[in-house]
Amino acid sequence: MYKRQAFCAWQTEYLLKGLGPAARYVQRYRLPTEAEWEYAARGKDQNEFPWDNADVASGNGCFYANFKPENGNYTKDGNLITSKVGIYSANSNGLFDMAGNVAEWTSTVYTEAGVEAMNDINPQLKYNAAKEDPYRLKRKSVRGGSWKDPETYIKSAWRTSEYQNQPRSYIGFRCVRSLANTTSQKSTKSKKR
């Protein structure tokens, strides 16, 4: 299990410990799918960037996210590399740092077809590659761009891939939970008295 998945599992267990019987209704933390990530990043108006305007080209975009606004200029926004989480405004969904700062892992297997390859039968393109699997099966979709990327890479629709077992200083992750009101996959144990 990779560290990002292990953290989601730890965060779930931490939450469940304090909830008692109500824990069975809590959805587990996980990485978002690629489609979920893009929907969340675009905001309520489905913007090209997570904010409400396209000031990136004028150089004002560096005040909306931590990215490289000009060729070789990493510090125009005042941050040499990663910035403190939440210092830029939230998007219309109330989410911070959906572009720039660090790109983000998704749980979706990377394919050239992208979200067009998803359908009702396979909405997530999930596959957890084992160590012995060929490298081509170990690519995961990465979204959002990072502090080292130019404007093109921080658009909400931009996507790339990295090998799931290769950590990168410019890629982080975001934990999400589904909102469904169903019983959690982990059942609570009742004690006999």
Q: Residue locations for each model-derived region?
A:
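Functional-site microenvironments in short loops/helix caps that host divalent-cation chemistry
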Residues: 3-156, 184-193
